[in-house]
Swiss-Prot record:
GO biological process, one term: negative regulation of Arp2/3 complex-mediated actin nucleation
Family from the record: Belongs to the actin-binding proteins ADF family. GMF subfamily.
Coiled coil residues, start to end: none
Species assigned in the record: Mus musculus
N-acetylserine: modified positions: S2
Protein name: Glia maturation factor gamma
Gene: Gmfg
PROSITE patterns: ADF_H (PS51263)
Record keywords: Acetylation, Growth factor
Length: 142
């Protein structure tokens, strides 16, 4: 049945990369960008970036193709505390091919569960990814 929702597996190498990323000791912003390998029907690592702001990260994301991002962000709270939340960002741009959109949407929950993340956000255009947007989203989790 070609119309059924395709849920992709998570590449075992990516699982290990996500595990290491979760327990990283560095205190800078960092990101893992992931994509769906359509032929293998698997979510795979596309890139790993260090010392990257939200504004720089958005330049790394394609404007017309979906991507998954796990972003470690140095968050300075209003009271001066510093935390390093891991954020899952699903970049799902308007204008993507419907079958590609479905493949990513169908795989999102499995990837979130695999990465054990609770801060899950979605953007419909890469322009939305700014530090202001991220802080607004994170303020909900105080």
């Amino acid at each position: 049945m070609s119309d059924s929702l395709v849920v992709c597996e998570v590449d075992p190498e990516l699982k290990e990369t996500l595990r290491k990323f979760r327990f990283r000791k560095e205190t800078n912003n960092a990101a893992i960008i992931m994509k769906v390998d359509k032929d293998r029907q698997m979510v795979v690592l596309e890139d790993e970036l260090q010392n990257i702001s939200p504004e720089e990260l958005k330049l790394e994301l394609p404007e017309r193709q979906p991507r998954f991002v796990v972003y470690s962000y140095k968050y300075v709270h209003d009271d001066g505390r510093v935390s390093y939340p891991l954020c899952f960002i699903f970049s799902s741009p308007v204008g993507c091919k419907p079958e590609q959109q479905m493949m990513y949407a169908g795989s999102k929950n499995r990837l979130v569960q695999t990465a054990e993340l609770t801060k899950v956000f979605e953007i419909r255009t890469t322009d939305d990814l700014t530090e202001t947007w991220l802080k607004e989203k994170l303020a909900f989790f105080r």
